[in-house]
UniProtKB/Swiss-Prot annotation:
Propeptide position ranges: 1-19, 52-61
Gene Ontology molecular-function annotations: ion channel regulator activity; toxin activity
Post-translational modification: Mostly non-hydroxylated. Contains 2 disulfide bonds.
GO cellular component: extracellular region
UniProt key word RNA-binding: no
Protein location: Secreted
Tissue and organ expression note: Expressed by the venom duct.
Keyword annotations: Cleavage on pair of basic residues, Disulfide bond, Ion channel impairing toxin, Secreted, Toxin
Domain notes: The cysteine framework is XIV (C-C-C-C).
Source taxonomy: Eukaryota, Metazoa, Spiralia, Lophotrochozoa, Mollusca
Full protein name: Conotoxin Am14.1
Role noted for this protein: Probable toxin that inhibits ion channels.
Length: 61
């Protein structure tokens, strides 16, 4: 969940922003970036790198 701490003195708590569009955008961004993350060895947390390895997308041919 995306949250923003309000900085005005009269604010009480945290404002929560809707994520309808951000979830879709994040998915599209990861779809593009995951192959590069997996090649670099940094994608395992966010990407399904094992599936990409099984498809032989990372061969040196």
């Amino acid at each position: 969940m995306l949250s923003v701490q309000l900085i005005t003195p009269s604010s009480h708590g945290t404002a929560h922003l809707p994520r309808d569009d951000t979830d879709a955008a994040a998915g599209e961004i990861l779809e593009f970036l995951c192959p590069f993350f997996c090649i670099g060895g940094i994608g395992d947390e966010y990407c399904d790198c094992q599936e990409k390895r099984d498809l032989d997308l990372f061969t040196d041919q």
